[in-house]
Amino acid sequence: MTNNARFGRIREFKVDTFQTMLIDELIPYVDANFRTMAKQSHRAMAGLSMGGMETKTITLNKPDVFAYYGLLSGGTYAPADIKDKSKVKLIFLSCGSKERPDGVKNAVIALKEAGFNAVSYVSENTAHEFLTWRRSLRELAPLLFQ
């Protein structure tokens, strides 16, 4: 996938091409060729950094496809972002302690108050880096498909 968004112009980023490929091509291919549980309730999407931004956009655009959402240093969800909370089984938000952990923690508080199953994780002494994301994945994985 190519995208011509330049540094500092993130608002110009378009996820449409990736979303179409993922939803209309990749997921149907995987479901047709591998032993999967091809239902929304058995599907998760998570991403780190820019992949988190893509994850947020796609999960909000396609709520009938995914039930578990994970943003690893990829922003937050607000309760008003999600139109039908009955479709969402888990929202996992994480970041490094040297990023902006208060945003993640406050978002999870708001999501919980709105009735969502939401979890935050802050990786101590890390920033926007792979150690943060490895630790975050370690925390997220056991929460999926429960």
Can you describe what each PLM-predicted range is?
Residues 1-146:
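Non-catalytic cap/lid and distal C-terminal segments of serine-dependent acyl enzymes
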